[in-house]
């Protein structure tokens, strides 16, 4: 039993993508010289650029969570909060701060709910770092520390890195998915976006020589 527990579980065979193959220029845009957001360790990166204040992102989130749960181990999902300025800025800082302080998983959906459903977090006028810190304090962190971390050098670095990736990927709206830094998905809706991403992931997998026995 111990030996079985220590042996790596066999990787699930990737599910063949559904629907028609995507068309370059219509379903996705090739990013010239595109690179993943961060080192992938040989995995296929899927970056979702989103904003907490974006209603479409709030609606997309449950679909993304379900989609993520079905991805095989060779897919690396990365969420990036877009620092587009205005009310995007404080909530992007909050995202990267929550990530840094280890409370992102338990707060991610809660922030969407607080902005779009409960209206307990403001959009206009802009929330202060202290207001945002007070919100996150309900999830087990020190609110004052959270607020000060939002303005820290480390978070500035994350904001800058995200901005650079978003700019070089040509992303100007949310939610947007970028596959392996090479393809910006331009689907006509949420399900269409995920379908296109599935095809592009399969394409990248095949290009890496990771095609399955079934030829997918």
Describe the predicted segments one by one.
Residues 37-40, 85, 123, 137, ...:
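Short N-terminal micro-motifs specific to bacterial/archaeal maturation
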Residues 48, 58-130, 167, 203, ...:
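Structural alpha/beta surface segment adjacent to cysteine/selenocysteine redox centers
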Residues 1-86, 206-216:
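Extracytoplasmic thiol/disulfide redox context detector
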Residues 101-107, 135-142:
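A structural motif
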Residues 1, 137-216:
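C-terminal cap of thioredoxin/glutaredoxin-like
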């Amino acid at each position: 039993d111990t030996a079985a527990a220590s042996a790596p579980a066999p990787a699930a065979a990737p599910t063949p993508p559904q629907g028609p193959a995507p068309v370059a220029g219509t379903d996705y845009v090739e990013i010239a010289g595109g690179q993943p957001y961060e080192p992938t360790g040989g995995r296929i990166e899927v970056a979702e650029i989103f904003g907490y204040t974006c209603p479409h992102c709030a609606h997309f989130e449950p679909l993304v969570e379900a989609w993520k749960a079905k991805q095989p181990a060779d897919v690396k999902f990365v969420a990036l909060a877009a620092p587009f300025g205005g009310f995007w800025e404080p909530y992007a800082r909050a995202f990267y701060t929550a990530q840094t302080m280890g409370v992102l998983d338990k707060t991610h959906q809660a922030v969407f709910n607080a902005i779009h459903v409960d209206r307990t977090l403001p959009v206009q006028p802009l929330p202060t770092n202290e207001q945002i810190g007070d919100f996150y304090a309900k999830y087990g962190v020190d609110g004052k520390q959270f607020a000060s971390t939002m303005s820290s050098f480390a978070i500035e670095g994350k904001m800058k890195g995200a901005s650079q990736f978003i700019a070089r990927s040509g992303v100007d709206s949310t939610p947007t998915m970028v596959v392996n830094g090479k393809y910006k998905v331009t689907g006509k809706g949420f399900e269409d976006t995920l379908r296109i991403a599935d095809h592009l992931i399969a394409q990248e997998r095949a290009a890496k020589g990771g095609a399955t026995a079934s030829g997918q």
